[in-house]
Amino acid sequence: MFERFTDRARRVVVLAQEEARMLNHNYIGTEHILLGLIHEGEGVAAKSLESLGISLEGVRSQVEEIIGQGQQAPSGHIPFTPRAKKVLELSLREALQLGHNYIGTEHILLGLIREGEGVAAQVLVKLGAELTRVRQQVIQLLSGYQGKEAAEAGTGGRGGESGNPSTSLVLDQFGRNLTAAAMEGKLDPVIGREKEIERVMQVLSRRTKNNPVLIGEPGVGKTAVVEGLAQAIVHGEVPETLKDKQLYTLDLGSLVAGSRYRGDFEERLKKVLKEINTRGDIILFIDELHTLVGAGAAEGAIDAASILKPKLARGELQTIGATTLDEYRKYIEKDAALERRFQPVQVGEPTVEHTIEILKGLRDRYEAHHRVSITDSAMVAAATLADRYINDRFLPDKAIDLIDEAGARMRIRRMTAPPDLREFDEKIADARREKESAIDAQDFEKAAALRDKEKQLVAQRAEREKQWRSGDLDVVAEVDDEQIAEVLGNWTGIPVFKLTEEETTRLLRMEEELHKRIIGQEDAVKAVSKAIRRTRAGLKDPKRPSGSFIFAGPSGVGKTELSKALANFLFGDDDALIQIDMGEFHDRFTASRLFGAPPGYVGYEEGGQLTEKVRRKPFSVVLFDEIEKAHQEIYNSLLQVLEDGRLTDGQGRTVDFKNTVLIFTSNLGTSDISKAVGLGFSQGGSENNYERMKQKVHDELKKHFRPEFLNRIDDIIVFHQLTQDEIIQMVDLMIGRVSNQLKTKDMALELSDKAKALLAKRGFDPVLGARPLRRTIQREIEDQLSEKILFEEIGPGQLVTVDVEGWDGEGQGEDAKFTFSGGPKRAETAEPDLAGAGAAGAPTAGTE
């Protein structure tokens, strides 16, 4: 039975329990149910009794006079009396007789009257309300104007008190009176939108087809336009044709809810329309207008849109709709008969300046709610940062959300107790435990000392809490632009907070930081550093990516590694790099894997490898490795990314690349030169070799890529070949990694200069660059070290020194051997300058 109770009926039962507790009664009788019905205040029962002059205080005094108060407040569950149970059973019977499939407050009141012998009935009679008269009043309210059967409310149906309950019962159940809410000051102020509100008024004032539909993207303020109209009606700022109108918003969900049988939904909607037609002063607002299409339609039934069409065409029903562009196109435009009955009113996204004005108008509401002060700079930051960095939502909604969450964040921080209060709690708990242990051990002297210590700690804690509450809580917290930026950073992962002195210094020293992992390549490091500084200072073109580069040059000189180092510098993690191997996209049809498959193709729901990653990480470094191996169609798709900073994926969503750094690596034009030039250890002529290689690379790039692609790239950087000194520095980096691994085993590693030079000789190939160096170190150093550790020739606490035998520093040293000797570890072993960086970064620093 209770599953049929409406929310209000359930609330009546809860209130009846509360009334029983207040009177110290250990049961719930009919009198408590009557008190609950009146206390609920909004249902049909409460309105019926109120119209008969029955008040809560009057009933309560009569109950106390008849029964009196109990001696002791009951604890636990309070049971119903048999008579109260009978009333609830009778309420079900009354509902069925009226043809209702729910039990509301009106049915419970009718059950009380039908029972007729309980304390509740006696109280009503004493207060001058004859039971038959009460019943008639309930039936009259249920029947409305025409005296027909009650409008079904459906479980969870909404209602609210209004000035004339008998004439707006159905609308109150299925909607909300916006003009009443505006009169009570419950609606947020509407800033701007005068043109849209005026256009809505014009359409509403037409003779026929006077139904505007607000069309716009989600979050631009379509509902706010309707709320602005409601406020204009209340303030009398409307033409004569709209004065004294009541604006109701219709809840289609409550209309459909509980309509179990065919015809239930249509009957409810007809009653709503009949009430609107009878009153003649109602304007209906239907949010999410597209839900009308198909709403309530079942086998043999017609949907809500078909029921409304005749009235909309004749001007008998004034309706304001609101829906998004996509939903309007998908649902409304397909139904031409429905579309022509509505006049579209476009609601565009406000500008940043307009959004700031909107935020200023809403400031008081959010300050009162969060108990904070919101500065002007916070509102400017919310509008500008939201517009720039949140691209899948619209102003002013996203800016308002930033302000709201920043206020909530500040309030939560202020309401959280400081750490020293928790420390006091822990100390007090420890003192109590020690005191109890001392008492158990009958060490009463120690227990007395601990008791005094506990009292002292409690007093200190109370004083500290008083300081916190009187100091921190009395001062109104301030939400400024930094708070807004922090919230945005949490949302998007974009570090848009103000440049601190530490961050500024780090950016100015960016080249130095990158060179901890990248050996040489001054041109490339400078170009990338300038692009990042330009972005962080806010001077880059807001429509283009933060930077776009082609890294060209021989294999194994650090092109990919620089991309990883950049991602590590920005995010502290190499995994922040979005790396795409373009060798996987050499066929025409594989381009769909990158940007998302079109509808009807395999993988449509999964999205593209590039677009999905950038949507989730809008502030990232994107590396297109070996771009020359990709199909030509992919270059065409990337033109829009390079120029406008955006790309449409297979599902029609716009992906934003404005906060990404795009890096393309290429080996074009370097293979022949690498073979001819070799390592380039001789300093003389190395610059000429580089210029020849650079010219060759540029020529090859122009042959392979279209001019419109190369023209959109910020910079083409040709990497230098590595010199002997740079190769030795790379040895330091890689050996530093091995040394750090040995540190975990309490061992240290040291290489002689001759050993480093021999590793550089054996580990560098003029064609493959520095990549073979990793394999050389693995073969010559790591393999032998691992054997010696397993044979226990080297153990914890030792310093392993690596030297070379049989090589005088000349030639390739084919017969030379590396020697390993173990000795006591020094207190502070001097590590190579760059060893730490090698451990922090990728294992093969300086290589791709």
Curated annotation (Swiss-Prot):
Residues 2-144 form the Clp R domain. One of its GO terms (molecular function) is ATP hydrolysis activity. Residues 5-70 are annotated as: Repeat 1. The lineage of its organism: Bacteria, Bacillati, Actinomycetota, Actinomycetes, Mycobacteriales. Keywords: ATP-binding, Chaperone, Nucleotide-binding, Repeat. It comes from Mycolicibacterium smegmatis (strain ATCC 700084 / mc(2)155). The keyword Chaperone applies. This is ATP-dependent Clp protease ATP-binding subunit ClpC1. ATP binds at residues 553-560, 617-626. Residues 835-848 have a biased composition (Low complexity).
